[in-house]
Amino acid sequence: KKTPDGFVITEFLPDVPWAGKYNTISCAANHHFYEGRWLRNAEILSDYASFWFSGSGNPRLYSFGAADAIYNYYLIHNDKMLLADLYPKLKDNFAKWEEEKRDSTGMFWQVDDRDGMEMSVSGHLSEGGRGYRPTINSYMYGEAVALAKIASIVDRDMEARTYQKKADKLKGIINRRLWDKQADFYKVIPLNGKMEFSYARELLGYIPWFYNIPPDNYSIAWKQLFDS
């Protein structure tokens, strides 16, 4: 919808108390960009991208891979000026994710509800739903990869190498720490002091494939989807 701050996208028709300005919410924003980038009118998502980093939006209220989303919008509309304008803000956003949600393990943690997944089995096993989740860690890997690509586009080659190194390191951590070898599946490690995998195989365990994180032999995780 058109607002005084330009076009925004909302998933709600009635106003809801958990949404932000103009009834926006960052929870599904990545999906909005991936689907909306095919719209012929590029102004809609260009405005929407700027909205999140204009001071009006709250891009970290929920898990939201903003750099990845905006980079994939760029691949369709080739709006280099938008990338150049938002790059410093996307860098700052990623740095804040690192500051707020990454700890000494090198992994990111998130609350299941803030992942946009309501209450979960793995969240029930932790303190306040917190855990090292394949979701947020995959999103942050995607952010680092996207920032590396954006940095190259705006001629920041040294920064591109820095972000690619961050991505490579996180990819290794995801594959070592969040892959349950007994279950052949990516799982949540609930934040409850035990550093043990949740007993549940949750659909979120397939999210790393969206970002091409798993090695080929991890494809065994898909076997149960086709096991009649």
Whereabouts are the PLM-identified features?
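Short, functionally important structural connectors and interaction interfaces within domains
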Residues: 69, 74, 128, 193-195, ...
